[in-house]
Amino acid sequence: MSQHVMFNAVLSSHPALFIQGEWRIGNGVSFEKQDPMSQQRLWQARAADHTDVTLACHAARAAFPAWARASLEQRATVIQQFAALLEQHKQSLARTISLETSKPYWETLTEVQAMIGKVAISLQAYQTRTGHSQTPMGDSMSVLRHRPHGVLAVFGPYNFPGHLPNGHIVPALLAGNTVVFKPSELTPWTAEETVKLWQQAGIPDGVLNLVQGGRETGEALAAQPDIDGLLFTGSAHTGYHLHRQLAGQPEKMLALEMGGNNALIVEQVKDRDAVVNLAIQSAFISAGQRCTCSRRLLVKTGAEGDAFLLRFTAVAQALRIGRWDEQPAPFMGAVISSQAAERMLAAQQHLLLLGGESLLNMTRPDSQSALLTPGIIDITNISEVPDEEYFGPLVSVIRYTDFTEALKIANQTRFGLAVGLVSEDRQQFEQLLLEARAGIVNWNKPLTGASSAAPFGGVGASGNHRPSAFYAADYCAWPMASLECEHLTLPATLSPGISFDLPKV
């Protein structure tokens, strides 16, 4: 480990909870974060127990009235100061994310840049999606306003520990909500460093609170009567659990952004290396740990498809993998933990036992590291393919005969996050748009490509119809409709059955 890393690593238990503007030591169990590459300890602290979580929610509730009544300009000033601090500390935060996730430094720099860009996008989205509008109606005015929910719990994932929670926290605060943030227990350090920047930005006490920990902390937060909503990004398994936990509480807003078993259809291969590059980016970027990564690669049967697969396999085998700060820079690093690496290897073995054919065997070169090499497995001949999101560098190949069959296969999943098409036939893309059950449908672009100026989310097991990104503003505030008239006068025409022509008493 470099001297720089040793200097910055948090190697002893410390105050890692941020509640009511103060850093506190948790009352829960001690837990630690290890470097996925070296397994050396990076961070250690005590988790938040039920008492800590309750305290954080009470702090957020107490801070809500003043924050909600502050002007939009006042709230935006704090958030813009946070963006300025992100710019100032971009490199150090990117290094922290790289250490925790093993993502290459070039990639985590883009993550912090996305966090910065989220502020301007969120301001635009707030005004576009949930702003103030009025329409004349005779002698009155129809006015639409939006009001914050109150206290929102934000659950962050580990694959983008800066960007994805930021995509909930920024619009939530902008709308006037207060927040209790529970990051993944696999990326506590990134969360701590991010909240320190919010503190420097001048966020008022209690407006943003941080509780660290695993499942017990998360369940305690979801069970809090003081929260008015919960914003979650993570696995379908955890999302379903939270949905059940909040069942029978329609008064609480629940936004679930979950994973996908995404299909990339390779219908035409005009420029072979261009298609291979797109497929590599779709399958293996971030070591396959993006919810939009292609888990299923649908390749047309025939010589063109055969040649594409040979080239795809060769390029995947030659991908540079390694430590985040190595030079030349690697394309991808390790998966998030040794346990995640073991799950991926078990998934590959399961598919092979079902009858899959390995085109490129995923391996773990060092048992003391979570680094995996890319894997490609042909599952065309498996009769009952598991409909699972294997969150790592493993892609399944399915051969098909015609486009109609490809569309059918693409939709054979309980998920509905992303689907993509490689073809120069516009009519095929139009057909895909009509038949796809997915929130993101890309044409000749990587599945992992998305715009912050568009909604991000899916259907089925990929979410509960509350897409994030530009549409996050929608669930961070509720609409208030008013009919308004400054002066009350008796209508010239009364409703039938009403008369004021009464005998004098």
Swiss-Prot record:
The gene is astD. One of its GO terms (molecular function) is succinylglutamate-semialdehyde dehydrogenase activity. It is an enzyme of class 1 (oxidoreductase). Keywords: Arginine metabolism, NAD, Oxidoreductase. It holds the Pfam family Aldedh. Catalyzes the NAD-dependent reduction of succinylglutamate semialdehyde into succinylglutamate. This is N-succinylglutamate 5-semialdehyde dehydrogenase. SUPFAM superfamilies: ALDH-like. Pathway: Amino-acid degradation; L-arginine degradation via AST pathway; L-glutamate and succinate from L-arginine: step 4/5. It comes from the Bacteria. InterPro entries: Ald_DH/histidinol_DH, Ald_DH_C, Ald_DH_CS_CYS, Ald_DH_CS_GLU, Ald_DH_N, Aldehyde_DH_dom, SuccinylGlu_semiald_DH_AstD.
